[in-house]
Amino acid sequence: MFALLMMLFASFVGLSGALLVWPGADRPQHVDAVLSLNGPDEHFREQRALALVRDGYARVLLFSEGHYPEVPCPKVPHVVVVCFVPKPARTVGEIEFAARYAARHRWHTIMVVPGHTQTARARLLLARCFQGRAVVVPAAAPPLLELPYQVAYEWGALVKALIVDPGC
């Protein structure tokens, strides 16, 4: 019994690492817009999204203000910045907003900047909600001391997205 529990624990740790701690990242590409998701590590996401639009990967930045509106809507020369409050104020609301906005503007590609541990859930929701091609470029990893909380939170959010509240 102990061996089985240890094997299950090791599998859980390995899966957590693969999905949440070291998520697969796409290479930045030229796209119709960059979507910056909101969350507790907002400054990492904002910095990454701003760097991508400043480097010319897109001329439009969709900036979610969600639960953390203390981060002001950024201003970027020669870039259209669309700040929005998603409804619902969760990742699914952000992805749904971006999908509707993209359809309205006939966009085919978006680059999404999720929180590092949020990458797997962002990919899941993009596959459900966005009809075009999505490039996922996660923000920098959170500080090591925040990682256990973020991994635990993300497991709950991922289960919710899979089972309880699938969205789109």
Residue locations for each model-derived region?
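Hydrophobic membrane-insertion alpha-helices, especially the h-region
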Residues: 1-17
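Structural signal for membrane-spanning alpha-helices in multi-pass inner-membrane proteins
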Residues: 16-21, 161, 165
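A structural signal for short, hydrophobic/glycine-enriched beta-strand patches
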Residues: 20-152, 156
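Short hydrophobic helices that act as membrane-entry/anchoring signals
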Residues: 150-168
